[in-house]
């Protein structure tokens, strides 16, 4: 295996499970023997497997698949697999120490992990459609992780997120000991945390809107060039925005009040409390927080809907304790598209 343009198709006509070892072994010329560790291999074609066929990646080499990988089960024990195709599909991916890089697009139903863990690097787009649980290893990359409606990704133990943007129309559960880091959070599903911290930061301009449920307790920290919209709240969550980040708190017509435990607007961070809309019947957002701190160098924007008959009828901020440091900035403005005070 390994010739450029070649493909591999395996069908199992028996009753048991067929196992295919992908180890990149290459025959060489001269006095060299087969390299047991495996060499880097490029396949321009596809790898497909029928029912009850398990593919296992062994050997330290990297296998690059230019076509489609469409298999029932893939176990990563050693080395790496790079998927460059646009229609990859795996029923089950098991991280056992190796690595998988998705440079194109892939759909995976279930991801599991062993104590050895492994790395799933997303440079393209990955859609999760089932229930996945990982306690060791990492999901990294600059691509997009999409948790479909009804699907769940649970990261516990030492498993971590690092760099991807996340669309959670299903459920993302973070209960591990490692702090997570993503470039943006979108979706209408659920984020569940167990007292940990999730950093939302990007080296390039990014924007995400999350309108789902915040469950449990935790901290969301926004920084870099990330703009994060939150249309939901939880009194057991803490928020922080700093170092170029923008945090926009924007309620909805059905729930214009957002509740949090504490918020810190840090140096070079922007906190924006924005009305739910610019129509005459659209309410201003009310932020209800136990403690809020406006640090030196922070900017806080209160964006009202002046199309209302009584735009100042309800407060945009209520807090148990408010701390304002010298050098904190505040702006009051009108909702974009609203002509009443433009």
Locate the predicted segments by residue.
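Beta-strand-rich extracellular passenger or scaffold domains
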Residues: 1-342
């Amino acid at each position: 295996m390994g010739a450029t343009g070649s493909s591999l198709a395996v069908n199992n006509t028996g009753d048991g499970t067929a196992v295919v070892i992908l180890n990149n072994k290459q025959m060489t010329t001269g006095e060299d023997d087969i390299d047991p560790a495996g060499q880097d291999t490029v396949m321009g074609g596809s790898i497909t497997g029928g029912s009850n066929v398990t593919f296992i990646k062994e050997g330290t080499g990297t296998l690059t698949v230019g076509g489609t990988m469409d298999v029932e089960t893939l176990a990563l024990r050693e080395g790496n697999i790079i998927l460059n195709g646009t229609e990859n599909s795996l029923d089950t991916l098991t991280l056992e120490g190796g690595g998988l890089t998705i440079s194109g697009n892939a759909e995976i139903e279930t991801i599991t992990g062993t104590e050895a863990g492994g790395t799933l690097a997303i440079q393209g787009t990955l859609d999760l459609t089932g229930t996945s649980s990982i306690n060791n290893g990492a999901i990294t990359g600059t691509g997009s992780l999409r948790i479909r409606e009804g699907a769940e990704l649970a990261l516990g133990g030492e498993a971590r997120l690092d760099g991807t943007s996340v669309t959670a129309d299903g459920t993302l559960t973070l209960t591990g000991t490692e702090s997570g880091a993503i470039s943006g959070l979108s979706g209408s599903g659920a984020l569940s945390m167990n007292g940990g911290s999730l950093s939302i930061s990007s080296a390039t301009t990014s924007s995400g809107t999350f309108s789902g449920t915040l469950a449990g307790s935790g901290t969301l920290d926004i920084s870099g060039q990330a703009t994060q919209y939150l249309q939901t709240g939880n009194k057991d969550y803490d928020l922080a925005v700093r170092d170029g980040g923008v945090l926009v708190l924007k309620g909805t017509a059905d729930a214009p009040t957002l509740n949090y435990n504490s918020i810190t607007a840090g140096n070079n961070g922007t906190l924006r409390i924005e009305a739910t809309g610019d129509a005459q019947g659209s309410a201003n957002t009310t932020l209800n927080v136990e403690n809020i701190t406006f640090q030196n160098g922070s900017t806080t924007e209160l964006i009202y809907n002046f199309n209302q008959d009584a735009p100042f009828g309800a407060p945009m901020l209520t807090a148990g304790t408010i701390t304002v440091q010298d050098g904190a900035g505040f702006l009051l403005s009108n909702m974009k598209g609203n002509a009443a005070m433009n």
